[in-house]
Amino acid sequence: MVTVEEVRKAQRAEGPATILAIGTATPANCILQSEYPDYYFRITNSEHKTELKEKFKRMCDKSMIRKRYMHLTEEILKENPNLCAYEAPSLDARQDMVVVEVPKLGKEAATKAIKEWGQPKSKITHVVFCTTSGVDMPGADYQLTKLLGLRPSVKRLMMYQQGCFAGGTVLRVAKDLAENNKGARVLVVCSEITAVTFRGPNDTHLDSLVGQALFGDGSAALIIGADPTPEIEKPIFELVSAAQTILPDSDGAIDGHLREVGLTFHLLKDVPGLISKNIEKSLVEAFKPLGISDWNSLFWIAHPGGPAILDQVESKLALKPEKLRATRHVLGEYGNMSSACVLFILDEMRRKCAEDGLKTTGEGLEWGVLFGFGPGLTVETVVLHSVGI
């Protein structure tokens, strides 16, 4: 008779969890940041709030965002005037929209990832779906399983309302699933649609206005598994370790409340300051075991909550400007897509490395770090190992 130890050994993978494919998708509706203040104040019937509009223009100018993608078109907003008010009961309209659109956008990204992976979708054993938009039962994980035609026995995990750090969380969870279940192939999807947070401007709630200047829609999907099949599966990054922590003295720094008026955000403290003050501790904990203490020797993927966070992290750690190139590029081209951002940055980095003829998927370097920052203040730290190109 076999022992429990033997069973456990047989169940576990040999090597580390590895990202085997990446796919991304956005809604078709593209919005230029330079034109957005005029559009936003017009569509929300707020053109009389001239001072507020000037303030919003400055926010948009400083955002370092060139364009964003949004499911909400002018037509949809005209049909749903309560979404354009500052605080009108609108949760039904918002939810009815996102419970359909979130899995749909997720399917687009997942289809691209599955195609790149090159394996039959029947080999997907687990689904991890993450969104801060739209809650129904059965959830977006179920809807995606149906839309893609995955096996009914696929093991699903649904993560709701995690916020901007969750791109790191899904990697941490997928790593554990892949390494503890031999042969597991995990489909990870982050799909975010801002229809749940869009609202008109108000003088008393400037935090909301910051969100209106930064947030965009997007979906990213990964296939993650350990022990890649040689010649068939092509590793992109290895997931070496993953940690989560709540920053000290950060209670209420970022809060989100899902109520009748939709999802409202409150930024109550100096978020960039809190992150930059504490980030080195997370780096030391993650990289000391590897004997790494030069943060410029790493490739960097950081959730671009906004330009101030990136500027302060860069300054605090004395990072060379090129370290956050991929991160700033994604912020500029898509805005802050919450949990999906860091996965878009992974995609941008590996694409640019191949284009530039670099030796590895991590800008020619061996080791890298991925950071997620969000409500809590919660920080996810993932240690990545690049793969030779």
Curated annotation (Swiss-Prot):
Subcellular location: Cytoplasm
The organism's place on the tree of life at top rank: Eukaryota
Cytoplasm found in the keyword field: yes
Pathway: Secondary metabolite biosynthesis; flavonoid biosynthesis
Swiss-Prot/TrEMBL catalytic activity: (E)-4-coumaroyl-CoA + 3 malonyl-CoA + 3 H(+) = 2',4,4',6'-tetrahydroxychalcone + 3 CO2 + 4 CoA
GO cellular component, one term: cytoplasm
Keywords: Acyltransferase, Cytoplasm, Flavonoid biosynthesis, Transferase
Active-site residues annotated for this sequence: C164
Endpoints of the signal sequence: none
Enzyme Commission number, as recorded: 2.3.1.74
A GO MF term: naringenin-chalcone synthase activity
InterPro entries (alphabetical): Chalcone/stilbene_synt_C (IPR012328), Chalcone/stilbene_synt_N (IPR001099), Chalcone/stilbene_synthase_AS (IPR018088), Polyketide_synthase_type-III (IPR011141), Thiolase-like (IPR016039)
GO biological process terms, semicolon-separated: flavonoid biosynthetic process; polyketide biosynthetic process
Record-stated family: Belongs to the thiolase-like superfamily. Chalcone/stilbene synthases family.
PANTHER family with a match to the protein in the record: CHALCONE SYNTHASE 1, HYDROXYMETHYLGLUTARYL-COA SYNTHASE
Function: Involved in the biosynthesis of prenylated phenolics natural products which contribute to the bitter taste of beer and display broad biological activities. Chalcone synthase that can use 4-coumaroyl-CoA to produce 4,2',4',6'-tetrahydroxychalcone (also termed naringenin-chalcone or chalcone) which can, under specific conditions, spontaneously isomerize into naringenin.
Protein name as it appears in the record: Chalcone synthase H2
Species per Swiss-Prot/TrEMBL record: Humulus lupulus
The encoding gene: chs_H1-132
